[in-house]
Amino acid sequence: MPFSDKQMPLRVKFLSKAASARPTEYLPRYLPNGEHRLGEIEWIFQQDSTQYDWLVVYDDLPLTPSGGNSQWEEKLACPRENTLLITAEPSTIKVYGKAFLAQFGHVLTSQEPWAIPHPNPIFSQCGLLWFYGKSHQEASIDFPIHKKFDISTVCSSKQQKHTLHSLRHEFTCRLKMEMPELEVFGHGHRFIQSKVEALDPFRYHLAIENHFTPHHWTEKLADTFLGGCLPFYFGCPNVFDYFPEESLIPLDIRDFEQSLETIRQAIRYKAYETRLPAIHEARRLVLEEYALFPMLSRLVPNLHQSTKKAFAIEVIQSRHTWRKKHPIGAIFYGLERWQISKMAARQKKAFLSAPL
């Protein structure tokens, strides 16, 4: 049943491989004002806590202090029904596997249905942690208004063929040749300490996802809005289910000439200035609706099953630990991974060969 305001706050433990070190310092930066209480939720970031009503795992369980592959095992202090996994990578990069997914009561994901064999999937954007460089509180009160330059992008030198990295890299390099004013940041290009440097001084930002599927928009778009930029965007096909149409300019990077003309026209006719109200609204949506903890603070109470019945104490294992302890299951996971990778490759091929 949905959580009631009359009850005590739900205590939700949050674990993440991405925040294995110093989670109590790192994760509160993504909470409004750094407060652990948000709506009906009290967030718990202590990895050894055993007093909680819910467990949320972001991508995978944390690394153990010795480092290397995650050996973490979490002895549940709540019913398995009150657990949630958030997938943080597309199907072209990570296959979570049926057995790992089965450990959780719910899965929040932007992966395709055929990649998530689970009875309770929630297909949505996943509130992926942003790389913008400012805390939630800092971003909320500091809209970048001093824009000195036109256009930037952040693009690594990755050129994997099984994802859209290679297409993104090729498009970016070609665009730089046509538009020398494009500032390219990232590994293999111009170094930055923080993504703020690549966003705050610029009016426009080229944001290209490495995967194309519904609901899959990432920090590449969220960071752009947080930096107060107008995105030239390629990625999530239903992005306008989330943001106002005036808040971004979609591109099809398979058509370079049309994309180049779209970018030049937008800059020439000052689209940034005319679309500024929509950018403000998109930025508000990121901070208040789609950011990880505000989003979860609404979702978890709606999923909550309150029970006073005793429940069997169970264990959730990291992906690595599960495969290590279930060698036969690991073989089946390898087969599952191969099958999903083939499906992802077919999907990519169909997308690249589809009419423009």
What are these regions (language model features)?
Residues 187-197:
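Conserved active-site histidine-acidic residue motif and adjacent donor-binding/catalytic loop
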Residues 2-86, 98-183, 196-205, 214-356:
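Pol beta-like nucleotidyltransferase catalytic core
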Residues 87-94:
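A short, histidine- and acid-enriched strand-loop-helix "catalytic/donor-clamping" loop
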Residues 208-210:
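Short Ser/Thr-rich beta->loop micro-motif in glycosyltransferases that lines
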